[in-house]
A protein has these predicted regions:
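Acetyl-CoA-dependent GNAT
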Residues: 3, 8, 13, 17-20, ...
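Acidic/polar helix N-cap motif
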Residues: 19-22, 158
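Terminal low-complexity, poorly structured segments
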Residues: 22-25, 130
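C-terminal "cap" of GNAT-fold acetyltransferases
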Residues: 110-114, 148-162, 166-200
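Conserved glycine-rich acetyl-CoA-binding loop
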Residues: 118-136, 145, 156-163, 167-168
Length: 200
């Protein structure tokens, strides 16, 4: 499940690959952005169970040390980065994207296919263009691995996110249930099929 930003507004950001040194910051960002975006949908116990399991330090360490996965963090350049490079490393990230091998439950998924697994932006930056920047970086990284297709899951009621992904060439391919505690969300699976010429 992921949520993008929409139309770029020319706000400067610094984006870089995450490392194990970013573990605590990534955990805080992951918990905060998921709760801001989807927390209202769930009973408190279901939400807490999901946050503790999905965004535990162990789970995030596994992602950051997996060579098949990549996480990028974005920082507001007005807070840290361009004007003070040292401040960038102490400021809190404002968005992130996670890419890796596809694990969605669809019969057409093939070994080597890629997935945009998470894309989240802090509240207040939803129209900054940051989601599109992160999406482009993650897609390019996945394309370097020459997959047959790219995939992602998106909440069935998130029309805005679906339109965003359509602009990146993703189309509806199926449905599944996304587990949050005892709750099951109705999710769409979207796919971007790739021709050989586009993978070169």
């Amino acid at each position: 499940m992921s949520i993008p930003t929409d139309t770029p507004q020319s706000r400067p950001f610094t984006i870089r690959r995450a490392t194990r040194a970013d573990l605590s910051a990534l955990q805080e960002l992951s918990i905060t952005t998921f709760t801001q975006t989807f927390g209202y949908l769930y009973a408190p116990d279901d939400l807490q169970d999901f946050l503790e399991s999905t965004y535990s330090l162990n789970a995030l360490t596994t992602l950051l040390t997996d060579p098949q996965c990549a996480v990028w963090l974005a920082f507001d350049a007005g807070v840290g980065g361009d004007t003070n490079p040292d401040a960038q490393e102490t400021s809190q990230p404002v968005a992130y994207v996670l890419a890796g091998p596809c694990s969605l439950p669809h019969p057409d998924v093939r070994s080597g296919d890629g997935e945009i697994k998470r894309l989240y932006v802090r509240q207040g930056l939803q129209n900054s263009g940051l989601g599109a920047q992160l999406m482009s970086i993650a897609v390019d990284w996945l394309l370097e691995r020459q997959p047959d297709a790219l995939w992602l899951g998106v909440w069935s009621r998130n029309d805005r996110a679906q339109r965003f992904y359509e602009r990146f060439g993703f189309t509806h391919a199926g449905e599944y249930r996304f587990k949050v505690g005892c709750h099951r969300d109705h999710e769409f699976i979207v796919k971007r099929a790739l021709h050989a010429s586009l993978r070169q």
